[in-house]
Curated annotation (Swiss-Prot):
Residues 1-16 form the signal peptide. GO terms for molecular function: aspartic-type endopeptidase activity. Belongs to the peptidase A1 family. The active site is at D92, D274. Residues 17-58 form a propeptide. Keywords: Aspartyl protease, Digestion, Disulfide bond, Hydrolase, Protease, Repeat, Signal, Zymogen. Its EC number is 3.4.23.4. The keyword Membrane does not apply. The lineage of its organism: Eukaryota, Metazoa, Chordata, Craniata, Vertebrata. Hydrolyzes a variety of proteins. This is Chymosin. Inhibited by pepstatin. Disulfide bonds join C105-C110, C265-C269, C308-C341.
Length: 381
């Protein structure tokens, strides 16, 4: 049955109706920007317990708990309003709201980015509802409205948009992206908000109720495809994994092994496939086992360093998911930056699920199927 669905999705791609390709640019991460300005050490010192705190079971009215996107590198363009105003966003499968800075925001972070001006859009409607997004280092305050949102060739005339009126400065001031477009399930969206992809499905704006992601290691070449699967981005066959909780794109991982020995997730664990998180995050004790197995040593502020000269002798870390093994070689789980190497694994005891971020997605082309509530994975080209 899944093979038939794949054929339908590929056929839809060939017909190009209701198919949207959004090129993703691999840009400079916030970590790199802070490092270039000599600010990274102070940032890590002050926020070492909030670097990847994105996922939480706490829910409040019109609020979510998001990461500070310290290592996020993949961004795309969208347009809001009539006439359209351009924004660079993170297409984030780990959250569900769309928000961008507004002209009502005077924070330094907002002033450094594109800001939406409702007075210059003839289609904007104020909802008279507030939005609060809590970060580990402060909160983003905003308001909600409706407006036309354009993603490539898809025009959604009545989309909920969050407009920030206050942003935590040390989080977003130097980021290359303006805002976030969430692609998780509607149960994660703030009150009164409908996720962008849900609106597209409801209005039959996409050929299939799925989207797929390819993340290149190069600056160009990454792609988000709405409504189709593109076999030119992977080799072999897609393998399908049931979504266990329809909030995040969450599923069961059977185990994590190194050299055939279980080092983490013994007996199974829950994981989230998240395009808005760069690292591969898990419970502190499990991640510590992995760091030891790969020979990483802890730095001053919680990061784990690797000797760049040892990459060829380091082991492969294998995730077994739904009975299939997904190897991550050292080239995948090691971040190399200006002669320094760090581990792509990060411990976070505040998260109840593992988070498989860009470190994993660069290795495996990923399909997010809302029609069947499945995740598809195949070896990326």
């Amino acid at each position: 049955m899944r093979g038939f669905v794949v054929l339908l999705a590929v056929f839809a791609l060939s017909q190009a109706s209701g198919i949207v390709r959004i090129p993703l640019h691999k840009g400079k991460s916030l970590r790199r920007a802070l490092k270039e300005r000599g600010l990274l050490e102070d940032f890590l010192k002050n926020h070492q317990h909030a670097v990847s705190r994105k996922h939480s079971n706490s829910r409040e009215v019109a609020s979510e708990f998001l990461t500070n996107y310290l290592d996020c590198q993949y961004f795309g363009k969208i347009y809001i309003g009539t006439p359209p105003q351009e924004f660079t966003v993170v297409f984030d499968t780990g959250s569900s709201d769309l928000w961008v800075p507004s002209v009502y925001c005077n924070s330094v972070a907002c002033q450094n980015h594109h800001r939406f001006d409702p007075s210059k859009s003839s289609t904007f409607q104020n909802m008279d509802k507030s939005l609060s997004i809590q970060y580990g280092t402060g909160s983003m305050q905003g308001l909600l409205g409706y407006d036309t949102v354009t993603v490539s060739s898809i025009v959604d005339p009545h989309q909920t948009v969050g407009l920030s009126t206050q942003e935590p400065g040390d989080v977003f001031t130097y980021s290359e992206f303006d805002g976030i477009l969430g692609l998780a399930y509607p149960s994660l969206a703030s009150e009164y908000s409908v996720p962008v992809f849900d609106n597209m499905m409801d209005r039959h704006l996409v050929a299939q109720d799925l989207f797929s992601v390819y993340m290149s290691r190069n600056e160009q070449g990454s792609m988000l495809t709405l409504g189709a699967i593109d076999p030119s981005y992977y080799t072999g066959s897609l393998h399908w994994i049931p979504v266990t909780v329809q909030e995040y794109w969450q599923f069961t991982v059977d185990s994590v092994t190194v050299d055939g020995v279980v080092v983490a997730c013994d007996g199974g664990c829950q994981a989230i496939l998240d395009t808005g998180t760069s690292m591969l995050v898990g419970p502190g004790s499990d991640i510590f086992n992995i760091q030891q197995a790969i020979g990483a040593t802890e730095g001053q502020y919680g990061e784990f360093d690797i000797d760049c000269g040892t990459l060829s002798s380091m082991p492969t870390v294998v995730f077994e998911i739904n009975g299939k093994k997904y190897p991550l070689p050292p080239s995948a789980y090691t971040n190399q930056d200006q002669g320094f190497c760090t581990s792509g694994f990060q411990g976070d005891d505040s998260s109840q699920q593992w988070i498989l971020g860009d470190v994993f997605i660069r290795e495996y082309y990923s399909v997010f199927d809302r029609a069947s509530n499945l995740v598809g994975l195949a070896k990326a080209i």
